[in-house]
Amino acid sequence: MACSAQHVANKVLSSYQWRLATKKYDPTKNVSDEDLDAILEAGRLAPSSYGLEPWRFLVVNLRDNQASEQSLCLKEKLYEPCYGARASLNGAHYLVILLARKNVNAESAYVKHMMHDIKQLPADFEPTYAAAFKNFQENMFDLAGNERATFDWACKQTYIALSNMLTMAAMIGVDSCPIEGFNREAVDKILEEEGLLDGGQYNDFGVSCMLSLGYRDMDPVQKRRQPAEDVIVRL
């Protein structure tokens, strides 16, 4: 029997009530491959400005008896500059590092690749699409010529993917924690040394945010949010 819209809404809201920023994970409990794939797929399917998907997700296995040599190396190297991830590194099963592309603009090879190869736009429409994106960057969001602002715009897109992954994780009972507590310059250097920021023929990457996944080893905490009337303004 098909679920009613209200039933689905209640399940989603119940999952949000259950979810918390997990500060302590149980190192003996692992996320199944199926659940991990579902979470990552939710991120991959996230919407993005102009549909440009300016992201990449690095999946670091934190289990010493499962992880690749590179994952174990990253686990060790990231501990010092990622003060907000240390509890996760000590117990979570996975750390997902969300990268954002740098210098994405209408003339970049990456945008042309997305238009032609991924979106498969008609050839006569590609100039119109590129012109619209250029106008957006130059005249609407004042991004043109500002590398940091353009990178921050790309980072904003990764947070949409992050939100999708957080929601999927909560819906299937996997605990998570979004992470911004890290030294961006130091993490970029580590990832660059590992060859993980190289965009190949397209734009290179920089770190945006992180997400840990596993199962909590902590008591539930009361969710505290501002009252709806202080947040929602119905016009």
Language-model regions, residue ranges each:
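Acidic, surface-exposed loops and disordered segments
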Residues: A2-L235
